[in-house]
C-alpha cells in the first residue's frame, strides 16, 4: 500500500503508528511542517513550507491556506492509495481539502472532546471534516459518542487503540541503577507521566504529596513531563515542603519510559479530560497499580477497587488516601498489576491494533477501486 499521513511529525504517537507500516514494507509518506528523529529509514517526509508574515494569528491562517495548495500538489505527485489525517480540527481539514479519497481521519481526543465545545467555528470545521471522511478512527467510547454528536454516521467509526509493545513495556524492565541514580532505592515510588499543563492538573498530585508523607515519610514521587506549569509546580512543591521527595525529571524519551515505569509501584493520572491514555496503558503493561481521575475514558480501563482506584477530579485528599492505601497494601497493589498486564495483552497489544488499522486501509482501498471500476462501466 501507498499510505499518506497528514499528522504531527514531532509526536511519538505519530512516529509509532507510521513506523509500523513502514517496517511492514508499505510505502509511507508523512506531510507536516515539523518532524523528529527516529522515523523508519524508508519513510518519506514532506515538510510544509511557511511563508506567512510573523504576525499572530495572521501567520497561522495564512500558512494554513498555503498548506492546502502544497498538500494538493503533493497528493497529486504521491498518488497515495489512502490518506490518514491525525487530529480532526487542523490536519483533518487539510485532508478534506486535498481533493482526494479515500480519507481516514483519526481522532486524538481533544479534537472531539474539547475544541468543538469551545468555539462554534471549530464545531463547524469538525462537522465538515467528519462528513468528508470515508472512515473515522477513535480509541475510546467517550470519543465515539462525541463523534456521533458531531454528526458522524455510526458505520463510519472504528475503535482502535494505539497499542502497547508489551515486550518493551514489561515489569522485567525494572532498573535498580536508575533508582539508585534518582536516590530512591528501597523506597515506594509513585510516578506521573503527563504534560505539565492545566488540562492534566498535576497540581492535584503535588497537593496530595504532603498528605501521603504524613503517613509514609519515605515515599518518593517522579513527575515526568514538561510544559508551561513546570516552574509553578516546582515552586508549589517547595512551598509545601516536599521538594526532597519529588523529582521533576522533565520530558522523557519514549525508550526511557519502560525503565521508569517498571521501577515504580503506583501510577497516577490527574487529567481533567482524556481519551484513552497511552501512558496509563503503558503503566498497566508494566504491572503498576493506577490511581486515576474519574473520566469516562479512564473507566473503560480501570474499575474502581478491582484493578486500580478512581478518584473525583480535583480531590487531592482522596488521591492521597488511595496512594497511601496502595503503598501499605502490597498484595492489593500486586493483584491490580497482574490484572492490568493481562488486560493490555488481551485488548491493546501494539501489533494486533496496528493490524486492525492495516485491514481497515485495505478494505477502504478495495472499496474505492471497486467504486471507480463501476463508474467506468
Predicted region positions:
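Carbohydrate-associated surface elements
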Residues: 142, 163
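Conserved donor-binding/catalytic core segment of Leloir-type glycosyltransferases
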Residues: 4, 178, 183-200, 206-209, ...
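Aromatic "clamp/platform" in nucleotide-sugar-dependent glycosyltransferases that forms part
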Residues: 272
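A short, well-ordered alpha-helix in the C-terminal region of glycosyltransferases
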Residues: 218, 318, 325, 332-347, ...
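Short hydrophobic beta-strand element within catalytic cores of glycosyltransferases
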Residues: 289-292
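Short alpha-helical donor nucleotide-sugar binding micro-motif in glycosyltransferases
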Residues: 75, 251-252, 259-264
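N-terminal subdomain of nucleotide-sugar transferases
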Residues: 1-37
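Conserved acidic donor-binding segment of nucleotide-sugar-dependent glycosyltransferases
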Residues: 304-305, 309-316, 325-331
Amino acid at each position: 500500500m501507498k499510505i499518506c499521513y497528514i499528522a504531527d511529525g514531532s509526536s511519538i504517537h505519530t512516529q509509532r503508528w507510521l513506523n509500523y507500516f513502514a517496517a511492514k514494507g508499505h510505502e509511507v509518506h508523512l506531510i507536516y511542517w515539523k518532524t523528529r528523529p527516529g522515523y523508519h529509514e524508508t519513510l518519506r517526509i514532506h515538510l510544509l513550507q511557511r511563508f506567512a508574515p510573523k504576525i499572530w494569528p495572521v501567520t497561522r491562517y495564512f500558512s494554513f491556506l498555503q498548506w492546502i495548495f502544497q498538500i494538493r500538489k503533493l497528493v497529486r505527485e504521491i498518488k497515495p492509495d489512502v490518506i490518514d489525517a491525525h487530529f480532526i480540527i487542523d490536519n483533518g481539514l487539510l485532508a478534506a481539502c486535498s481533493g482526494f479519497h479515500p480519507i481516514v481521519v483519526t481522532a486524538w481526543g481533544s479534537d472531539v472532546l474539547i475544541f468543538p465545545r469551545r468555539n462554534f467555528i471549530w464545531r463547524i470545521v469538525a462537522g465538515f471534516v467528519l462528513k468528508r471522511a470515508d472512515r473515522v478512527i477513535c480509541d475510546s467510547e467517550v470519543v465515539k459518542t462525541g463523534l456521533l454528536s458531531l454528526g458522524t454516521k455510526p458505520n463510519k467509526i472504528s475503535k482502535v487503540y494505539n497499542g502497547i509493545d508489551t515486550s518493551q513495556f514489561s515489569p522485567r524492565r525494572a532498573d535498580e541503577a536508575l533508582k539508585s541514580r534518582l536516590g530512591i532505592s528501597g523506597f515506594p515510588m509513585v510516578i506521573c507521566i503527563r504534560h505539565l499543563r492545566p488540562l492534566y492538573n498535576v497540581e492535584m498530585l503535588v497537593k496530595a504529596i504532603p498528605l501521603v508523607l504524613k503517613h509514609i515519610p519515605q515515599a518518593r514521587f517522579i513527575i515526568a513531563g514538561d510544559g508551561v506549569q513546570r516552574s509553578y509546580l516546582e515552586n508549589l512543591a517547595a512551598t509545601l515542603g516536599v521538594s526532597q521527595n519529588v523529582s521533576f525529571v522533565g520530558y522523557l524519551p519514549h525508550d526511557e519510559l519502560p525503565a521508569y515505569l517498571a521501577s515504580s509501584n503506583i501510577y497516577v493520572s490527574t487529567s481533567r479530560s482524556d481519551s484513552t491514555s497511552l501512558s496509563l496503558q503503558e503503566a498497566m503493561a508494566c504491572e503498576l497499580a493506577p490511581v486515576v481521575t474519574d473520566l469516562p475514558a479512564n473507566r473503560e480501563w480501570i474499575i474502581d477497587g478491582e484493578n486500580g482506584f478512581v478518584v473525583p477530579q480535583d480531590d487531592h485528599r482522596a488521591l492521597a488516601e488511595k496512594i497511601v492505601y496502595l503503598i501499605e497494601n502490597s498484595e492489593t497493589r500486586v493483584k491490580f498489576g497482574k490484572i492490568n498486564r493481562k488486560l493490555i495483552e488481551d485488548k491493546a497489544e501494539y501489533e494486533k491494533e496496528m493490524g486492525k488499522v492495516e485491514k481497515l486501509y485495505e478494505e477502504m482501498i478495495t472499496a474505492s477501486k471497486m467504486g471507480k471500476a463501476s463508474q467506468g462501466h
